[in-house]
Amino acid sequence: MNELKNKLIGEGKENNILDYNEFLFLYRIGIPCQSRHILWDCLIDNPCGITNDIFNYYSQQIKEFDFNMQKADILEKINHNKPSGEDEEDELSNKIIIDMIKSEDLFINELYILQKSTSEILSKIYKLIYIFFLMRRDIPYNKNIINYAFVFILVFNDEYTSFKNLYNFICSSNIIKYLIKDNNYIEKNIDLFNRLMKKYTPKCYNHFNNLDISSELFSVFWFENLFTQTLNYKIILRIFDLFLIYGDELLFQIGLAIIKIEEEDLINYPINEIFKILRRLPNKYDEELFFENLDLINIHDYYNNYISKTNLSDQLDFLCSESLVTY
């Protein structure tokens, strides 16, 4: 991916698609919709070697699918306590459809705003997810992939290109560590976010500490679905733009930006209201305000220092260099 970034972004235009200043400007104002699929395709690349032939091979294993018909069938089975499936493939199919039904209202709202066909998009999402888990039987089913599939279908529309980028995005980034429940990785991220809250949002850190609220209760939720269940999709698409460049560091920066924006309410509201705020922010969340706050939070040096030292044998020295952060 780094080689592609270098080709995409350089000091000048001679051998690059964009020069560095143009690139920063695009990312600051948001990549135009008509350019997003080109940039994502370049940045994600295809390290897993997903070809059209591979996609077609697995596509042929899927029965003709219409989301609305399958939804009606599943709901009837649930209402009448009928068996949901007889084999592994049926069980996978039913899990996907049930989780898509639970997310349908969110998708419909976004698709209405974007003037997209709901039934067609949802059928494509199902196909992408089903093929992904057919190919990666080593990964336990995880409903968060529905949100990722929705994002990639919105950007690419074409089924093969959407799947190729979705598969490579998940399997060649740390996102997969949330899908497989890598506890060491997740616990390290929780610890880092606690430390960052203490440093950058001390009022909320102290308030949460007094209420015995652990950041684990919301940060893991944010990170494992890349904020797709928390923010509206205009913001989400721009977050994915940035994530493809900055990677995991951006997740912590976004989390701090949300807490900073909502700080006044978070330190004055009771626990149940705090979780409502942190789980699902209003659809009319101001896009420009969000990215202005994001720009103000610079964690780059602290983040790199933490990651480098926790990856080396002197991890203990780093942990002892600050007072232990606990909730």
Task: Write out the residue ranges for each language-model feature.
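C-terminal regulatory/linker segments that are acidic, Ser/Thr- and Pro-rich
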Residues: 22, 256-327
